[in-house]
Amino acid sequence: MEIIEAIREACGSEFPISVRLSSSEFLDGVGIRHGITLEESIRTAVACEKAGVNLINVSSGTHFTGNTIVEPTTYQQGWKLGLAAEIKKNLTIPVAATSVFRDPEFCDETLGSGAIDFVAMGRSWLADPEWGEKALSGRADDIRKCLGCMYCFETAGNALCTGEGHAQCSVNPYLGEETVYSAPTEDGNGRKAVVIGGGPAGLEAALILAQRKFDVTLMEKEDRLGGQMYLSSLPPHRG
């Protein structure tokens, strides 16, 4: 609380202060008796509001329950919204929360329900930096969705341990390389290009050619695109 009060004193009454708060560490699930619980988090959030905080940003988990912080694909959207909603009931300031938000429609439903005031997202924006723009412009179907495959988490951890590399994304090859791979040069001038095969490689080739202003024809012998990606999407809980 002293830190919050010092920030307020140094930055003034108009400066917004947000506090990230764990709603629960879920340690009872791994046999550890002591840890942050929802009841304790509610008391902390109330104290933060009294100290002058403008927003509570609710997360969860700890090192021992890492899957509740960065959830793999088996976790459903909104699975821990109830925790943030309980915290919000005790406050008058806005509450943001993480809870595996993938689809704009689900985000709208969540905000419309009044459970929280803001959705907090991370990996979805790594997968598609234009997530928000596409959602607002009615292009939700064009969003490149996070798979929940944890590859960004794995590569970020490796980079921290070795001092080399950076977080990478299974569906966004430009992540961390934005200054290296800028927008493709528009040198197609309407010339015709044919791509044979509508698997992941063919689709990416067709996309880049189209961005380069080629007149692209994509040919696929099957009645669906995606190649082997279609088969990999069939098991439950796949992105």
For every predicted segment, state its role.
Residues 143, 147-148, 231-239:
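N-terminal glycine-rich dinucleotide-binding loop that anchors FAD/FMN and/or NAD(P) in oxidoreductases
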Residues 227-228:
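Radical SAM [4Fe-4S] cluster-binding motif and immediate context
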Residues 1-196, 200-211, 215-216, 224:
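Flavin-dependent oxidoreductase catalytic cores
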